[in-house]
A protein has these predicted regions:
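Short, well-formed alpha-helical segments that are part of the catalytic scaffolds
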Residues: 28-35, 56-69
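Catalytic donor/gating beta->alpha subdomain of glycosyltransferases that bind UDP-sugars
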Residues: 161, 168-194, 222-268
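Active-site nucleotide-sugar/metal-binding loop of Leloir-type enzymes
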Residues: 123-139
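Short beta-strand-to-loop acidic/aromatic patch adjacent to the donor-nucleotide binding site
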Residues: 136-148
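Acceptor/aglycone-binding surface of glycosyltransferases and processive sugar-polymer synthases
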Residues: 113-127, 158-159, 163-218, 222-223
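Cell-envelope/extracellular polymer assembly enzymes that use nucleotide-activated donors
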Residues: 45-48, 77
Length: 268
């Protein structure tokens, strides 16, 4: 019995040594968007923000307000896709835009019925992208309706993409961690996500590892067109990572990091 315990202990030690030394430095937390200096250019790219929303009336007043009040001085428009909500999500959204005097920056898109072969969120997002494409933006920001964005988040994302010639920039936002179970499970989730997708490898063009965090993805319009649009991941189980893999597989450059100032409002 003692020999078995010793063997298992040594095996665990070898595995952890391998992970620590050769598995993409997954424990590192230095891939943070806020650590990048914000550079202001005279001419900034245009951005269309696409927000799929279904029965999000309780969080829209916070999340949409944070988007409308971004300090990004370039041209940006928000397309909120109302995915057949029954709680007045669209009305709340219009009220928020009116309250902050930003009605010119918000367009409401009413989602059509879900076709065969699509997941609900991706279908809503695809409709938003299609409508936003009429403006031929340089970038799309794909973000969830339950994300409260730091006032400079869009500026940081665009600066990161432009300064490093990236096709896709994504951040894992700071997840809500208040209840007992959230405090127990959320840190473990982030830890194991980084173990599965070491950010050092994701951000290395020479590595095939690809990942993104679906709550906040900035993608260049041309890169999205090159891979065939969102329809190529319409049935993907992990759509955010599938999108990142499609971009990287088509010789695109991607970056994934953490954010400490942009947060998720959703309880877990």
């Amino acid at each position: 019995m003692a020999a078995i315990i010793l063997s298992l202990t040594l095996l665990c030690l070898v595995i952890w040594l391998f992970l620590l030394l050769f598995w993409g430095q997954f424990w590192q937390v230095n891939h943070q968007l806020e650590s990048n200096k914000i550079v202001i250019k005279k001419t900034l790219p245009t951005v269309c923000v696409v927000v799929p929303a279904r029965n999000e009336a309780n969080v829209i007043p916070i999340s949409l307000r944070s988007l409308l009040l971004q300090d990004y001085t370039g041209n940006f428009t928000i397309f909120l896709v109302d995915d057949q909500s029954s709680d007045g999500t669209a009305n709340f959204a219009q009220g928020v835009a009116y309250a902050v005097d930003k009605t010119d920056k918000l367009q409401i898109v009413s989602s059509e019925s879900l076709p065969t072969g699509w997941t609900g969120k991706l279908w809503a997002m695809a409709q938003g992208v299609e409508k936003a494409s009429e403006l031929t933006p340089d970038y799309f920001l794909l973000t969830d309706a339950d994300i409260e964005h730091d006032i400079s988040n869009l500026r940081r994302l665009v600066t990161k993409a432009e300064s490093q010639d990236l096709d896709l920039v994504s951040i894992m936002v700071r997840l809500r961690c208040q209840s007992f179970w959230e405090k127990l499970l959320i840190p473990a989730f982030v830890f194991f996500f980084q173990k599965l997708y070491p950010f050092f490898w994701v951000n290395n063009p020479k590595k095939t590892t690809a990942a993104a965090a679906g709550g906040c993805i900035l993608i260049h319009r041309e890169a999205l067109n090159r891979i065939g649009g969102l329809q190529i991941i319409r049935q993907a189980l992990i759509d955010d990572c599938s999108l990142a893999k499609a971009v990287k597989s088509n010789h695109g450059k991607i970056w994934l990091g953490l954010s400490t100032s942009t947060i998720s409002l959703r309880p877990y």
